């Protein structure tokens, strides 16, 4: 997907306009998966463009019945791009500007925008860090991976997904959960609703099969589509 700077400028203006309204009450979304639920608190103040982009996909229902197609133990889980029905990559909007310089770090529980080696190539796929991953943060000589939120409830579900058995499945050459992990839906919730505990998922089957985490670019330490 090509990065168009002029489109980013227009999108950035819109994102900045809504950021101030959202920042006071950080928006939250509930991710319902075949292994349980977890809640993400978004940070529109630090990552206005990326949050607006993510919420666009949420509101369009893009994530319904998609996969956590890549799981890397002690690293990340990644998903939101491939349909659960046929494992094909779903159409997505244009890529957005990389907001990795926003000061948010890829620490355990942080949620970021997956991309390819090209710095401004992220669109729909996201990942959750299941460990501290400073190698994904930007440095003076290269772009990082943009964090735009954090898991505030249900990290145990994320950990269970991160522990499933993986291998070669369909089009995925490695790191794909042997037993597909489906994102059944992602929905916006208010702060009051978020305070209610999410239902726990049943314990994983004794087979150990489970979800997968996000695909990374050439570097083994980075999330990509």
Regions found by a protein language model. Give the residues of each.
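Cyclophilin-like peptidyl-prolyl cis-trans isomerases
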Residues: 2-6, 13, 18-225
């Amino acid at each position: 997907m090509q990065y168009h700077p002029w489109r980013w400028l227009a999108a950035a203006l819109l994102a900045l306009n809504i950021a101030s309204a959202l920042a006071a009450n950080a928006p939250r979304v509930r991710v319902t998966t075949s292994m349980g639920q977890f809640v993400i608190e978004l940070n529109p103040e630090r990552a206005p463009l990326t949050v607006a982009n993510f919420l666009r996909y949420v509101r369009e229902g893009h994530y319904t019945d998609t996969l956590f197609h890549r799981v890397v133990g002690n690293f990340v889980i990644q998903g939101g791009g491939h349909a659960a029905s046929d494992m094909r990559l779903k159409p997505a909007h244009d890529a957005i500007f990389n907001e990795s310089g926003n000061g948010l770090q890829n620490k355990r529980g942080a949620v970021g925008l997956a991309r390819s080696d090209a710095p401004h190539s992220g669109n729909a796929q996201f990942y959750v860090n299941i460990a501290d991953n400073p190698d994904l943060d930007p440095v003076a000589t290269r772009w990082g991976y943009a964090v735009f939120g954090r898991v505030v409830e249900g990290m145990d579900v994320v950990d269970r997904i991160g522990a499933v058995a993986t291998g070669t499945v369909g089009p995925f050459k490695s790191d794909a959960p042997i037993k597909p992990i489906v994102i059944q839906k992602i929905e916006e919730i208010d702060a009051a609703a978020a305070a209610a505990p999410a239902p726990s998922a049943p314990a994983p089957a004794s087979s150990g099969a489970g979800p997968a985490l996000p695909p990374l670019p050439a570097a083994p330490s980075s999330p990509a589509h």
